[in-house]
Amino acid sequence: MAEVESPLKLSGAPPPPEGVGGGHCSEISTELIRSLTELQELEAVYERLCGEEKAVEKELDALLEQQNTIESKMVTLHRMGPSLQLIEGDAKQLAGMITFTCSLAENVSSKVRQLDLAKNRLYQAIQRADDILDLKFCMDGVQTALRNEDYEQAAAHIHRYLCLDKSVIELSRQGKEGSMIDANLKLLQEAEQRLKAIVAEKFAIATKEGDLPQVERFFKIFPLLGLHEDGLSKFSEYLCKQVASKAEENLLLVLGSDMSDRRAAVIFADTLTLLFEGIARIVETHQPIVETYYGPGRLFTLIKYLQVECDTQVEKVVNKFIKQRDYHQQFRLVQSNLMRNSATEKIEPRELDPVLTEVTLMNARSELYLRFLRKRISADFEVGDSMASEEVKQEHQKCLDKLLNNCLLSCTMQELIGFYITMEEYFMRETVNKAVALDTYEKGQLTSSMVDDVFYIVKKCIGRALSSSNIDCLCAMINLATRELEADFRDVLCNKLRMGFPATTLQDIQRGVTSAVNIMHSSLQQGKFDTKGIESTDEAKLSFLVTLNNVEVCSENISTLKKTLESDCTKLFSQGIGGEQAQAKFDSCLSDLAAVSNKFRDLLQEGLAELNSSAVKPQVQPWINTFLSVSHSIEEEEFNDYEANDPWVQQFILNLEQQMAEFKASLSPVIYDSLTGLMTSLVAVELEKVVLKSTFNRLGGLQFDKELRSLIAYLTTVTTWTIRDKFARLSQMATILNLERVTEILDYWGANSGPLTWRLTPAEVRQVLALRIDFRNEDIKRLRL
């Protein structure tokens, strides 16, 4: 029997994939089928063929379904045939035109390149010829100019020679005329060296004789000879001698001046001002010359030399200032006095006043001068660096910062300001202490003298620091003033308020004695004790009220000072003084100052609370308690009698008015209004307590409503505080006490409340309803609130 595949292998072969077109033939050949003899093998082959038949049928069905689409596409393709033939012809024609154009362009561009090459060679030839002619012209011209002593013209010829292209000259030397060119070059080089020597000699003679026109004449020639640095160096040396001569002359005038002169107190500041103005005039005068003849970016070199001389002269002036004003000696005395438990004799603050003013003026003039230099150099660099890289610009900025920040002028002023801050601190502290010690009160005034005196001193010290134009100095003084106001001055006011308002009842007397003992104990611990004796009650009351006014004015003055400083420093920052870091430091100092204002407000609230509890509450409570002695379970006759002869509220209002009138004359409007607000809160709380202890009938509730309305109407006229909100609970209690029946409350409660917000809880509503003697408890308990 022929060898055939096993049925398992045949049956395990994968069927052809469905839906795949393309005439797949069966893998089972006719010969294979004929060779099969077993039934099982025949069945396996049969199943395989059936599967292939089904796949072919599916593929055929899919092709038949696409027949219409394919036929329509074929029709479309037949129609497109003529058009495609036309397009093919046009495309061939276009390709031919492009090929022709490309060839033509290539021919033209090659000829243009040849023309460019010829033109460049022609230009080079012309340049070479021009340079040879220029060389000959320069050689002839410089000889003639030197003979005629026309040094400007000679320098112009040398400058023209120096600008010639050296490579062209080198090529010319290799040509036929090389020997002639070498001769011309040698003559020009000799003329160059000769002219340099002449210019240097003439410039030296002019500077020695002080002939400014001649100095400027030869100064302009240096850059034509390529001697930029040499020219700037020599010219700067001449200018520095001028500066030194004038500065020494001014210093001699200072040392010989009359100390009674009007400007004697600031004579050293004036001397520095003259020095700075002289240098500024030199820069303004010669900047156009430097820019024109030396080019932009060269002004920095000139100013660098001038600043060295400026530092030398500043050092001389400052040394004379320190010696003549005893600046260091005064600083040492101040430093010793600032130390606790120091036995050094105290220096009088007013002796420091003129010295401190002069130091800040000196620093202000220095800052103005340095800002002038920064502005001029930056503008010059900006023009010169217009095409430079970012690295070059940054390097120039570093050089500028180094020059101005590290110069001796800046360091010296920084040292003087460091001493100034310590001395100004001493001046402020001592004068503030003196103002507190000499505190007086004039009748009719709301505040005592020390408030105006202290803030005059603080403003003067901060203003003086501000006038220095040094942000670090200003911030230091703001911090010192903040500390002085917060610690020392606030403690003075705080101790006065802690003495309390004079007591009027036995309980208040006991509290006042305890407070006084605490203050005395605190004073003894600090080594200070006031031996003036115990003031009378009226004086103590007035002292307490004046202190309250002082605290309120201090808070307002600090806020005003903060706003003023913000405005003044905005102008400083707009002038370019300081930067973002200085702005942040200044803002931080102002925040600390504002915090002190808030602490004074807190102290004021503590004082008001003490006044309210000591003076208002002991009086108001008994007046409110008389409400309990007035019956509110009344008949029609009594109700009418109450209307004619009010039993409580009118007298209560009169008592309040009389009591508050005493405070109104002695307190500032702001404090009086705050005290009135505390009083109204007290009245609302205490009245609610006595109402809950009373009983009412319908007419009594109506009477209470009238009394409450009268009281609210009066209190509304005496304060700007919101009264109705404080009396909202009492008003709702009056509404409840006016109800005709218990269930009427439901017309005002819950969903029926409308815009009304109930301040009373359901339990409190039931408590108020229970005050009505004509309401039954059973009805009240049945309410669903």
Curated annotation (Swiss-Prot):
Modified residues (N-acetylalanine): A2
InterPro entries per record: COG4, COG4_C, COG4_M, COG4_N
UniProt keywords, alphabetically: Acetylation, Cytoplasm, Golgi apparatus, Membrane, Phosphoprotein, Protein transport, Transport
Region (Interaction with SCFD1): 2-84
Chain segments carrying region D domain: 618-740
Family: Belongs to the COG4 family.
Region (Disordered): 1-24
Name used for this protein in its record: Conserved oligomeric Golgi complex subunit 4
UniProt-annotated stretches for the region E domain: 741-785
One BP term from GO: protein transport
Compartment(s): Cytoplasm, Cytosol; Golgi apparatus membrane
A Pfam cross-reference name: COG4_C
Region (Interaction with STX5): 85-153
PANTHER family, A to Z: CONSERVED OLIGOMERIC GOLGI COMPLEX SUBUNIT 4
Chain positions found as Phosphoserine: S6
Gene3D superfamilies to which the protein is assigned, alphabetical: 1.20.58.1970, ESAT-6-like
Single GO cellular component term: cytosol
Self-association state and partner proteins as the record states: Monomer. Component of the conserved oligomeric Golgi (COG) complex which is composed of eight different subunits and is required for normal Golgi morphology and localization. Mediates interaction of SCFD1 with the COG complex. Interacts with STX5.
Topology of the protein relative to the lipid bilayer: Peripheral membrane protein
Purpose: Required for normal Golgi function. Plays a role in SNARE-pin assembly and Golgi-to-ER retrograde transport via its interaction with SCFD1.
